[in-house]
């Protein structure tokens, strides 16, 4: 579907996370991980793994997949060109970023050159420190910065939950306010 949209002239941008791959790598490296309110507490070692997995393995895997299908994709990270600018969300969470600004220059350049930008959800603060960002939040902020006509979420979870710990709290209808 991504390639079809691209072929008919729709500017498609793919923003991704990679929680399961991050978990697998943290486990393999024997780095303990825990969550607070659905957000991964991210110390420096964890951030190194997050960046390695998202900007490396997952991002390049998606680019390779799209390329194998005949697409023209380019792998980007929110750090590139200071694209996703953040500040630390909460000291308790460590290097988890709250998005302050999206600089669309790199995205616009990639789109103008005919590429499908594939963007990993890692941001950067004013001191050059990478931060972990929720991919859904990054996608939403990027779509808003680009005045996108449409935003589509694909996920490995059932949908939006009123209580993330309660699978019966799935919201079947959302209203934009």
Regions found by a protein language model. Give the residues of each.
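Nucleotide/pyrophosphate-binding catalytic subdomain
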Residues: 1-177
């Amino acid at each position: 579907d991504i390639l079809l949209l691209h072929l008919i002239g729709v500017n498609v941008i793919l923003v991704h996370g990679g929680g399961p791959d991050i978990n697998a790598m943290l486990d393999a490296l024997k780095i303990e991980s825990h969550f607070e309110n659905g957000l991964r507490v991210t110390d420096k070692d964890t951030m190194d793994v997050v960046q390695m997995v998202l900007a490396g393995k997952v991002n390049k895997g998606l680019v390779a997949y799209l390329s194998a299908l005949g697409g023209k994709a380019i792998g980007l990270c929110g750090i590139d060109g200071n694209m996703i600018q953040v500040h630390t969300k909460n000291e308790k969470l460590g290097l988890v970023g709250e998005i302050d600004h999206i600089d669309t220059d790199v995205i616009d350049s990639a789109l103008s050159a005919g590429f499908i930008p594939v963007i990993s959800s890692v941001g950067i603060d004013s001191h050059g420190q990478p931060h972990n960002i929720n991919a859904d939040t990054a996608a939403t902020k990027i779509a808003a910065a680009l005045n996108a006509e449409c935003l589509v979420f694909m996920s490995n979870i059932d949908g939006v939950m009123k209580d993330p710990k309660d699978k019966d709290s799935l919201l079947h209808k959302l209203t934009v306010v």
